[in-house]
Amino acid sequence: MKIYYREKSAGIEILRCFGIESRVEIPGMIDGKLVISAAPYAFSSHMDEKEDLKNASLWEVSDGLEFGREEHVLAGNDVEEIVFPYTLKEIGRYIFYGCGNLKKLEFSDSLMQIGCGAFTGCHALEKLTIHMRQGKKSGVKEMLGEMWQRIDVNFLYEYEEARLVFPEHYDEAVENTPARILYTEYHGSGSNYRQCFYDKELNYQEYDRLFEMAVAMDKLEVLVDMSFGRLEFPYELTGKARENYREYIRKNLGDIAEYLVKQEDMHRLEVISSQKLWTLEGIDSALDCASKRKETEVSAFLMNERANLVDNTAGSERIDVDKLQNSQEADRTEQGKNEQSQTTEKSLNRRTILRKKRFEL
């Protein structure tokens, strides 16, 4: 890979990259100096290379993959994934302008300065991964503010991880012809979720509080990823929020289980088991779907889980019956004691009366 760059007072600024792979990983150091920024239009196909690369320095590294293959500029639709080093602090304006195939972006919480229009035209971007090395603040809010589509965000803290979903949001003008009224119709809860940041820090309690709104406005697959993501990676998840996510899965188990079967998502079917959320109705719905799709592995797993569920249910019922029988037996014993006590008392009273009568005679 070849990288054109310029030296600045504090470090290196990336100008342009050339290579053969759609995944671009920027080094943290070039010629012994830290890489601290990426220039405007650095990954855009709209850069005037002849003008902007004048007097630029060249850094080159070979990994053996280029043999017999011609390098090309890594910009526009030729870029699908970019990994920035933890040293990078700034990206310039319109840096990804027109990168229509860019899907993943990885960086650290050092990246705080985001140039205007940085993500213009990045309609395929779907995932951000942020290495949180310094605290809880990041440049994610500014990035999300430029994109309307659903974005999955992974925050990687020192010892924990948070996997979040920021749903899509858009509005459209709808005309009511008879009334001659034009009004705006809003779709998706993404706009509200993007407001959960305060001073560049995500408020997880506010994020979880919005789930009720998401249930009313977003699609099943979005809600599944949100709820399972929070339950599996419960960073700053309160007990109340945890129960809200569990309750959503429990109430919609039939639809969710069918969706997971169609996605062949064994992992999340196992999560339902570990969270003890299965019901007979939900598991039968999943079994029916797996059977129709001839998913033998999934069917075997679900049949085993169903058997365990039936056994546990029967065990609970047996325990309840035993408790009832023990309770009834205790009641009968107590009743017998009371009757015996009453009989003894009556006998004593009768003797007392007879003594009184003899005394009177």
Which residue ranges define each predicted feature?
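Structural signature of tandem-repeat unit edges
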Residues: 1-11, 18-36, 48-90, 100-113, ...
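Surface-exposed repetitive/solenoidal architectures
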Residues: 1-4, 14-19, 39-42, 237, ...
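C-terminal per-repeat helix/turn "cap" of leucine-rich repeat
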Residues: 42, 72, 94-95, 117-118
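Ankyrin repeat structural motif
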Residues: 93, 264-273, 295-304
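Long amphipathic alpha-helical scaffold regions
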Residues: 114-139, 284-313
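Ankyrin repeat domain, specifically the short helix-to-loop turn at the C-terminus of the second helix
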Residues: 239-243, 271-278, 300-309
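Ankyrin-repeat boundary/"N-cap" motif
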Residues: 247-262, 273, 280-291, 313-325
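Charge-dense, extended regions
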Residues: 288-361
